[in-house]
Design a protein with these regions (language model features):
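N-terminal cap/lid segment of alpha/beta-hydrolase-fold proteins
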Residues: 30-66
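The serine-hydrolase catalytic nucleophile loop
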Residues: 80-92
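Conserved alpha/beta-hydrolase
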Residues: 94-114
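Catalytic nucleophile-loop/oxyanion-hole region of alpha/beta-hydrolase
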Residues: 110-143
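Hydrolase active-site cap/lid region
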Residues: 165-207
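Short beta-strand/loop motif that positions the catalytic acidic residue
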Residues: 226, 232-234, 238
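Short alpha-helix in the alpha/beta-hydrolase fold that links the catalytic acid
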Residues: 228, 242-251
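Catalytic histidine-centered segment of alpha/beta-hydrolase-like enzymes
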Residues: 265-275
Length: 288
């Protein structure tokens, strides 16, 4: 029990460190769009709020100076206790390829979320709903090619989202996806009655609902419903996410799914390892 608790603690810690750098009617907020940073060489960044029913989702939209002929966007889903800032790693590569990029803050997904920082209401189910809302929003705005990129817990959310939105997600990228989260917590809390009202991980307080909703969830029985192109990137020294899960996911997805293993990389990439990820991403996107 403690072993699995420790693994998830590591997931929380590493995701936090890396972040330094339903069918719902979806509509755009009467959005206040403003430049957040200095104009980049290959594009600009702006704030964009998207609504999912009563939920308001904050995000940062990067628009390249030279967009692709076919309107294309990558949507970035951060990991546990992360934020939209994770998406900035992708601006250079995506801008060079002519892709827009939208990185969101999952409501209740982080103590630093600009959408909603009340992590007691964190929920995988809600994050899937929010990501689906974002995908549908950009589809409604005329983007014909939508790529979803998810890291760690965001990888789990992205995989579940793509399984539901088979026709709307053009390509899927999973970066050390934490498909193990339900199984880890099921072992820590074998019975529903074992779940505490509040579970705290590295200062992040999570409510019962998070654990109740995933108690019987089996992602590997679901994610293969998505049959589009998939890229999985993971390090062979990852002590949080089992390489076996990623290998099995590769087999569950359509033929041609690529699992790129970065030698020596753990759960969270150093700059040289991040460069490898971007090289793989560029090759993957150029195929379509």
């Amino acid at each position: 029990m403690m072993k699995h608790h420790y693994l998830f603690l590591k997931l929380a810690m590493l995701a936090l460190a890396m972040q330094l750098t339903a069918n719902t009617e979806v509509q755009a907020q009467d959005v206040q769009v403003q430049t957040m940073h200095e104009e980049l060489e290959n594009g600009i960044t702006q704030t964009l709020w998207i609504e999912n029913g009563a939920r308001r989702i904050f995000g940062e939209l990067f628009t390249p100076q030279q967009p692709r002929k076919e309107s294309s966007i990558a949507i970035i889903a951060h990991g546990f206790n992360g934020t939209h800032e994770y998406g900035r790693h992708y601006h250079e590569t995506l801008g060079r390829l002519g892709y827009s990029c939208y990185a969101l803050d999952f409501p209740c997904g982080s103590v630093r979320s600009r959408s909603d920082s009340n992590t007691l209401n964190m929920s995988i189910i809600d994050e899937v709903s929010d990501l689906k809302a974002v995908v549908r929003h950009f589809r409604s705005q005329g983007f014909r090619h939508v790529v979803v990129i998810g890291e760690s817990q965001g990888g789990l959310v992205s995989a579940l989202t793509a399984a539901d939105l088979k026709q709307d997600v053009s390509q899927l990228v999973l970066v050390y996806p934490a498909l193990c989260i339900p199984d880890n917590w099921r072992k820590h809390y074998p019975r529903l009655e074992d779940i505490r009202d509040v579970t705290e991980l590295w200062g992040v307080k999570m409510g019962r609902r998070f654990f109740e909703e995933i108690h019987d969830m089996k992602p590997l029985d679901i994610i293969g419903q998505y049959r589009g192109p998939v890229l999985i990137v993971q390090g062979d020294k990852d002590q949080v996410v089992s390489m076996d899960d990623s290998r099995r996911a590769q087999q569950l997805y359509a033929p041609g799914t690529r699992l790129h293993v970065i030698p020596g990389a753990a759960h969270g990439f150093r700059p040289d390892e991040l460069k490898q990820e971007m090289e793989q991403l560029e090759t993957f996107l150029k195929k379509e």
